[in-house]
Amino acid sequence: MLVEVGNVEAIFRYPVKSMAGERLERGILGWHGLDGDRRLAFRRMDDSSSFPWLTASRLPELLLFLPQRGECGTEENLPTHVRTPEGKLMPIFGTDLAKDVGRRYGSPVEMMQLKHGIFDDASISLIASDTVREIGRLASQSPDVRRFRPNVNRGYVVEAKRS
């Protein structure tokens, strides 16, 4: 017997690691997460570690960059351009975008595409609305759920009776 444990309030996808995300009406969830999620990232060219990706913890401005799809889209429905915080639209694999981000970061970067995505910990991130509300209560703020960069924002939980 299926038991309802909650509802999905929102689905988010972040095509480029640490850049602005997009809200989806629906998505395809597979072994490697949500299709199109975190499939692109800037690689720090001077970093040979096992995690060379440029993230918002190193460059908070990345969160203000907005990946956008062209009319035709691309294979795997990936973005074709990025709108900078100043409003400039640049090709996602163009040298201008890499130079702009590298200048802000202070070191060269290059855009990379990975088949299975670039995840810090898990290929899908879920957060409950109750968790966000409790964090807000404790911090005396109303945080935007996107601050936590979830793929799924889960709503209420129902106590299920089994027969």
Which functions belong to the PLM regions below?
Residues 1-163:
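Electropositive, beta-rich accessory/interaction domains or terminal extensions
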